[in-house]
Amino acid sequence: KDFIGWLWTLKVKVGHSVRTIKDIEKITKSDLKEFTSYLSYRIIFCKKNKLPSLNSDLDKVSNKWNKDKFFNAKKLEQNNRFKSFDSTEFNLEPDLKESPGCLRDFQTALWILEHCFKIKKLEDCIKLNLFTREEIVSVNKSYAHIKGLRYILNLYSNSNRLSFENQLLLAKKSKLKSSKKSSAVEKFMRVFF
């Protein structure tokens, strides 16, 4: 409670909940977003002897969403998100969290790999011949780049949107310089896309 209060004081928005396993089972049975949130949960405080039991209980909750149902629901969710961000406005000023190719797509892929294939780390995909090492390196580099941009943007703006103003800001923070051929913002957005 004190930790969350401290974060709020710092104006950090953080998703959080305090729930029993029974609460989690009830909520996640029919709510995809709630279920997905438990695929990437982070424990702030837990007694060591309770952790194996917690993981076992969460595995039971996980079994309520079969692989096909989960995959199809995530695909539908992604298609709906793509439709809502399919406009000239969002093509010119993408949202670092929700626009196609941004954080939510990386997260969706990770959630599908974890739930449907029991893969905890991208590197495990190499052992299963799902991806090459080069592909994993490229994905990790892109994911880190988008997360880094969002982090910097969130330090200066209360938005995930790469508005023209924010593009200028991030181009400047990236120390890009304009040239005769292209402006710093054009260079920044070329790297982004």
Identify what each model region corresponds to:
Residues 2-49, 148:
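Conserved catalytic core of two-metal-ion nucleotidyltransferases
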Residues 56, 64-193:
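Conserved nucleotidyltransferase catalytic core and NTase-mimicking acidic/glycine-rich helix/loop elements
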Residues 43-64:
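Long, acidic, intrinsically disordered low-complexity segments
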